[in-house]
Amino acid sequence: MRILLIEDDNLIGNGLQIGLTKLGFAVDWFTDGKTGMAALTSAPYDAVVLDLTLPKLDGLEVLQQWRSNHQDVPVLILTARDTLDERVKGLQSGADDYLCKPFALAEVAARLQALIRRRYGYHHSVIEQAGVKLDQNQRSVWLNNQPISLTSREYKLLELFMLNKDRVLSRSSIEEKLSSWDEEISSGALDVHIYNLRQKLGKQFIRTVHGVGYALGQVEK
């Protein structure tokens, strides 16, 4: 899943980018409010981690402008502003969650996963589809109650398909969702990952919708 991170503290921002990437997220990091606000429309982000005390444009103003422009991406405020009034104001301005610094990386990741699941209509960390069970907390996959070994890329690709079980995904949208600006997924690599998933989960589990992209097997053209 692709995350937009707006944080001006280099130590915190670098730690979040590295840590969340290791946990399977693709992370684009910006250090000021003005650039971060503009970045939201540049890629299909699944969620935003937003600091409030930012140079050039305050994080609360960034959030308010997004919401006034009908940008509905889930936003997790991550800030040192910890008073009750500030937390209430952040949530009333359109934030979906609010977490105060200092924080634990595991909690940030768990909150992001919960926000993204809700966006796609799921309320549990275990997603099941056609005999395949994906556990986001354990990052494990089971087929007919048997564990399946996947690479990190294969897991992220499978997670994307299962969260979008009723949608056809184009090649470009898959590549954008799974990579940050600091990395790219080549078209050939995507073909290899899809081939490997079909070998492990069944050839019909991921269907090619000719001229459009890919979908889980039960999705109609």
From Swiss-Prot:
Modification after translation, per record: Phosphorylated by QseC.
Compartment list: Cytoplasm
GO BP annotation list: regulation of DNA-templated transcription
UniProt cross-references to Gene3D superfamilies, sorted A to Z: 3.40.50.2300, 6.10.250.690, Winged helix-like DNA-binding domain superfamily/Winged helix DNA-binding domain
Cited InterPro entries: CheY-like_superfamily, OmpR/PhoB-type_DNA-bd, Sig_transdc_resp-reg_receiver, WalR-like, WH-like_DNA-bd_sf
Keywords linked to the UniProt accession: Cytoplasm, DNA-binding, Phosphoprotein, Transcription, Transcription regulation, Two-component regulatory system
SUPFAM superfamilies given in the database record: CheY-like
One Gene Ontology cellular component annotation held by this UniProt entry: cytosol
Keyword Transcription regulation included in the entry's annotation: yes
Name of the protein in its database record: Transcriptional regulatory protein QseB
The organism of origin for this protein: Haemophilus influenzae (strain ATCC 51907 / DSM 11121 / KW20 / Rd)
